């Protein structure tokens, strides 16, 4: 019971940090464009941040490259990490 309460409290605390974005033409469907540092088998991407320009695929990739990160389209971004990512 205590674990359940702790788990729900942590989810409630993390919810405001999830940033909802308007869909862009860079990534398909509900994927979110992110610039990520490390990719673990396409399942987990680490150290991700929102790109400064995601108006087109070339601008998205260039914006990520200027910071030394890789352009990725991720299904579930959460607290600087992301799940199920693909290349744009």
From Swiss-Prot:
<feature type="disulfide bond">
    <location>
        <begin position="74"/>
        <end position="85"/>
    </location>
</feature>
<comment type="function">
    <text>Aerial growth, conidiation, and dispersal of filamentous fungi in the environment rely upon a capability of their secreting small amphipathic proteins called hydrophobins (HPBs) with low sequence identity. Class I can self-assemble into an outermost layer of rodlet bundles on aerial cell surfaces, conferring cellular hydrophobicity that supports fungal growth, development and dispersal; whereas Class II form highly ordered films at water-air interfaces through intermolecular interactions but contribute nothing to the rodlet structure.</text>
</comment>
<feature type="disulfide bond">
    <location>
        <begin position="27"/>
        <end position="73"/>
    </location>
</feature>
<feature type="disulfide bond">
    <location>
        <begin position="36"/>
        <end position="48"/>
    </location>
</feature>
<dbReference type="InterPro" id="IPR010636">
    <property type="entry name" value="Cerato-ulmin_hydrophobin"/>
</dbReference>
<comment type="subunit">
    <text>Homotetramer. Further self-assembles to form highly ordered films at water-air interfaces through intermolecular interactions.</text>
</comment>
<dbReference type="InterPro" id="IPR036686">
    <property type="entry name" value="Hydrophobin_sf"/>
</dbReference>
<dbReference type="GO" id="GO:0005576">
    <property type="term" value="C:extracellular region"/>
</dbReference>
<comment type="similarity">
    <text>Belongs to the cerato-ulmin hydrophobin family.</text>
</comment>
<keyword id="KW-0964">Secreted</keyword>
<feature type="disulfide bond">
    <location>
        <begin position="35"/>
        <end position="64"/>
    </location>
</feature>
<keyword id="KW-0134">Cell wall</keyword>
<feature type="signal peptide">
    <location>
        <begin position="1"/>
        <end position="14"/>
    </location>
</feature>
<protein>
    <recommendedName>
        <fullName>Class II hydrophobin 5</fullName>
    </recommendedName>
</protein>
<keyword id="KW-1015">Disulfide bond</keyword>
<keyword id="KW-0732">Signal</keyword>
<dbReference type="Pfam" id="PF06766">
    <property type="entry name" value="Hydrophobin_2"/>
</dbReference>
């Amino acid at each position: 019971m205590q674990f359940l309460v702790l788990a729900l409290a942590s989810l409630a605390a993390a919810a405001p940090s999830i940033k909802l974005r308007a869909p862009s033409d860079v990534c398909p469907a509900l994927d979110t464009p992110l610039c990520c540092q490390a990719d673990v088998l396409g399942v987990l991407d680490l150290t991700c941040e929102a790109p400064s320009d995601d108006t087109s695929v070339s601008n998205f990739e260039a914006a990520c490259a200027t910071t030394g990160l890789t352009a990725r389209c991720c299904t579930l971004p959460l607290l600087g990490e992301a799940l199920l990512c693909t290349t744009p």
